[in-house]
């Protein structure tokens, strides 16, 4: 019988949900060695390390890949602030790719399937890391 004792190293994945101004960003700033990908500009008045605000979905994915490549040498916690603004970048990317003016223009729910698949790429990138998210 193979018994394993002790902690198994793994990163914590946390989602913080709440209305604007409740302190989600301030709370995340207290996490171990945080690095923010600030999609909405919520860290302007907080002394934190941040990457340039992504202007496209591709830029956001590239930032995550770079942090992942550096692993824990660049930060211990990667904070995506916020997921709903990241989703808007994703929607714009999908609409541009398929030459649609909006996510509803694909027909019965198809745009949301593309959104789920594309956003899943980001979640997979985040999952394969030893950095807290």
Predicted segments, located by residue:
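Conserved P-loop
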Residues: 2-80, 84-89
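Amphipathic alpha-helical transducer elements in NTP-driven molecular machines
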Residues: 54-61, 109-124
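A solvent-exposed, charged loop/short amphipathic helix patch at secondary-structure junctions
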Residues: 88-115
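Conserved small/polar residues in nucleotide/adenosyl-binding loops
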Residues: 131-133
């Amino acid at each position: 019988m193979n018994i394993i004792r002790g902690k198994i190293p793994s990163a914590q994945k946390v989602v913080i949900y709440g209305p604007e101004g409740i302190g989600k960003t301030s709370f995340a700033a207290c996490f171990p060695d945080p690095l923010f990908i600030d999609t909405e500009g919520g860290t302007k008045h907080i002394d934190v390390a941040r990457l340039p605000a992504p202007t496209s979905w591709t830029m956001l994915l590239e930032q995550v890949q770079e942090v992942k490549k550096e692993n824990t040498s660049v930060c211990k916690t990667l904070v995506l602030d916020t997921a709903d603004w990241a989703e808007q970048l994703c929607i714009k990317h999908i609409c541009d790719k398929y030459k649609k003016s909006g996510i509803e223009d694909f027909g019965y729910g198809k745009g949301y399937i593309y959104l789920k698949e594309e956003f899943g790429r980001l979640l997979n990138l985040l999952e394969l890391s030893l950095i807290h998210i």
